[in-house]
Amino acid sequence: MKSCLIVDDSKVIRKVARHILETLEFEVEEAGDGEEALSRCETKMPDVVLLDWNMPVMSGMEFLRLLRQRGHSDQPKVVFCTTENDMAHIRAALEAGADEYVMKPFDRETLHIKLQLVGVA
């Protein structure tokens, strides 16, 4: 079973994403910010991370840069899930090591397509 770490400071977004991912047969873990997410990745690296941009403690971009700098051999796919929709944000995320980008709010079909594009669904 594929695993996914949902990283978002919104409990509502985490709940919706969890429901969608579980219907797609993913094992799901959650983190409320980038710092907590890094800790979870050190314990058990997921196959994919759904990542919010703006969070307290550590932003999604900070998390992504640190994750990629650590150079683990089992790097997860990273899909940014955010309301930031301008080209500068999208380009910055991809340059920092994100694999895909999805806009909030998202539905099951959209998320499933993005997960297929990165090779985990």
Predicted regions and their residues:
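Charged docking surfaces used in two-component/phosphorelay signaling
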Residues: K15-T23
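Alpha4 helix (beta4-alpha4-beta5 surface) of REC/receiver domains from two-component response regulators
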Residues: E62, N85-E100, T110
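Receiver (REC) domain active-site loop signature in two-component systems and cognate sites
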Residues: M55
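Active-site beta3 strand of CheY-like receiver
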Residues: K44-L50
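A Lys-centered signature of the CheY-like receiver
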Residues: K104
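Acidic catalytic/metal-coordinating carboxylates
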Residues: D33-E36, S59-R65
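Short hydrophobic/Thr-rich beta-strand motif most characteristic of the beta2 strand and flanking loop
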Residues: E25-G32, R40
